[in-house]
Amino acid sequence: LVKGHPFFTESPFCMKHIIDIDAWERRDNYGFFRSFVNSWYSVTTEIDCTEASAAARAAKRSFFLYYLYAVVRSANEVDELRYRTDKEGRVVFHDRVDIISPIAVPGKTFYTVRIPYHEDFERFYAEAHALITDIPEDGDPYGAEKILAEQGDYDVVHLSAVPKMYFTSITYTLAEAGNG
């Protein structure tokens, strides 16, 4: 997408663009799937991470952060993975999506952290490392999720990584009216 493209209007925040559904080439797909209880999709695949894991070890860095970066970078390189529906029910296109991941906290279960995407790996790594090593003891484990729900812009990719656990597919809960 580029400025002036005929099927979106720019939001004042310049991070998301409101799609004109009537002029959108995916209008029919959207109309078909929009009423599904779970219209989300997830991709589960096996990836050989041997070289990436070795590179992280050699650099004395977190393989987990290498992995998060690879996932969020890939999502940002594919336009179709940056479309969302906002709290007003409008389809929006985000210039950038961040990543949310649960981080294990000693003595507790986990803490959900939103890590901003930066194309520059070093900047991403430094900020992500600072965020996951400075989780407040008395913080809300679902704070990042609650902020997303309040703002109504789901400009993120959700990723849970469980080290050394083999599985071929997983889905997660999705809060919706009536199940609460």
Task: List where the protein language model places each region.
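Helical lid/core segments from catalytic subdomains that handle acyl or acyl-like groups
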Residues: 105-167
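Hydrophobic "lid/gating" helix adjacent to the active-site nucleophile
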Residues: 61-99
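Aromatic (phenylalanine/tyrosine) cluster motif
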Residues: 7-8, 13
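Flexible, Gly/Pro-enriched loop and linker segments at secondary-structure and domain junctions
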Residues: 15-44, 64, 154-180
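Acyl/amide activation-and-transfer machinery of modular secondary-metabolite enzymes
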Residues: 36-54, 95-123
